[in-house]
Amino acid sequence: MDMKHTLLEALGIEIVENTAERCVAVMPVDHRTVQPFGYLHGGASVALAETAASAGAQNLIDHTTQACVGLEINANHLKSVKEGTVKAIAEPVHIGRTTIVYHIHIYDEQERLICISRCTLAVIKK
C-alpha cells in the first residue's frame, strides 16, 4: 500500500502488523497530531483507528473485484496523551458479504487504553 502523499504520511502513521486476524498501526504524538493544548487530537486517533481497520480489511476481500470504504466510525477517548507513540490494534468482529466491522483499541506507550473505536467498512464492487 503506497502511503506517499496521503493522510497516513502526513500524520506519521505506520502499519507494523497486518493479518486477517488483526492489524497494528502506530502513530507519533507530536506537532502533527496534537491539538492546540498539546494533547493528542481526537481526530488523529480516529484517523489511526480507521487506518488500522481499513488496512486489516484488505486481507479479507478479493482485490480483483472488491474494495473497502469507510461507512461509519465512532470513538470514545478515555485518556489524554502528550508525547510518545500510540498503537492501534484492530480486530474484525463481523466479516459479512457487504460490510466488515472492526473494533479498535488504542494504547499509549505504557499500554494504557486511551481510546476505543468501532469502524464499519462497506465492501463494494470495483
Curated annotation (Swiss-Prot):
Record-linked CDD domains: PaaI_thioesterase
EC category name: hydrolase
A GO CC annotation given for this chain: cytosol
Listed InterPro entries: HotDog_dom_sf, PAAI_dom, Thioestr_dom
UniProt keyword terms in alphabetical order: Hydrolase
Top-level taxonomic group: Bacteria
A molecular function (GO) term: 1,4-dihydroxy-2-naphthoyl-CoA thioesterase activity
EC number(s) recorded for this UniProt protein: 3.1.2.-
Biological role stated in the UniProt entry: Is not required for competence.
Family statement: Belongs to the thioesterase PaaI family.
PANTHER family named in the record: 1,4-DIHYDROXY-2-NAPHTHOYL-COA THIOESTERASE 1
Protein name: Putative esterase ComA2
Organism: Bacillus subtilis (strain 168)
